[in-house]
Amino acid sequence: MRLFDIDLINRYNRSGPRYTSYPSANNFSEFSLEEYEQQTDLSSRRRSSISLYCHIPFCNTVCYYCGCNKVVTKDKAKAKPYLDALYKEIDMQSLLFDKTQIVKQMHFGGGTPTFLSGEQIIQLSNKLQQAFNFELNGEYSIEIDPRGIDKNLIESLAIARFNRISIGVQDFDFEVQKAVNRVQSFNQTKKVIDIARVNDFSSVSIDLIYGLPRQSKDTFIKTLEKVNDLRPERISLFNYAHLPERFKPQRRIALEELPNPAEKLRIFQYSLEYLIAQGYIYIGMDHFALPDDPLAIAQIEGNLHRNFQGYSTHSECDIVGLGVSSIGHVADSYSQNEKDLKRYYQALESGHLPISKGLILNTDDKIRRALIMELICHFEVNIQRLEKRFSIRFISYFEECLLELLQMQSDGLIKLNNESLKVMERGKLLVRNVCMVFDTYLKFTEESFSKTI
């Protein structure tokens, strides 16, 4: 059965969440520090494992496609007050968790974490290790920009206990790079990866984006071939969402230079077929991995999870978000820090955590979240297990979803019976659409998301 079915894609391609959480972050609302502390207390009593996410917002230059929370500056001195504030937040957060809780994952994202010097990264990592209880052989990853990195900085990352790197490439074509203000050569990227492998980094991940200005199937073929030469363990292939009304840098992208919808689909189709032909496993949505990568193994073993950093091998971890705009998932809650750097500083100077909004999951949220995560990660839901876990009857609980599900079954996207809901091969690229059937929040927020393909 074909994975790529153009007729189905054209019929179902609409805006929808990436489901790095459920409910999605744009449903967060007022959330008190007292509520957060109740959730950290619950996490401690459960002895939940911890994943630390640390946001470094600074970038030397602006990439026009980017929708991340960032501060564009070449002034390296701005890192010092930010780190001082971050250290305060780390101290405050660490007091809310039990010392027996183990940190199994750590991720530095941005912005550009390698805006910091090697010494600053080591100091920040040491601070986290002093504040929390780290697993000896955990997964510790960092996003890097090859344009401003050298051998010494890679060695500093290794000293700081990082063992995985994520590199934003997006496209190796020079014309595309100029159009998005991110010129980065293949040789720069290869050099950094080679140094990382010499320093025993166990995994390299590369991010690509399809749908960028001046991009075509023919140009992107060459990018894919170069990426395959680098042979990263993981590849993320994101759909560019042009939302200039929300993301100011995107206003510098000429609308007429974007590939038309048909060409964009051709780029995606070829990319999908090429990567699978080169031995990569399609994990789901926007991720590919080599067969021996922990992501691929976790999917086979039924242990795959999805969070704000994408797919993950640690489903049991609570996420502690640190830094401006970072998002956490602790016990039965989601929370997000202040997005504005000034307000982030003010909160910490006043002696309280900079949490600005969040959400406590109700019973319905938990049921739908569990179902959506199973679909996103494993393309199948064991209905009887879900019913037993939450004391529900699937057919009656999701009665309002049945008409859409039956239509999807008629179209060959899914197979539904008393035992399971399974996403079929031709429906895997449209798994977000299947999840959207169960999303009770979607009718209020659909216009703010990217297309599902």
Predicted regions mapped to residue ranges:
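Local cysteine-cluster metal-coordination motifs and their immediate loop/turn environment
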Residues: C54-K70
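A short, conserved structural fragment
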Residues: Q409-E419
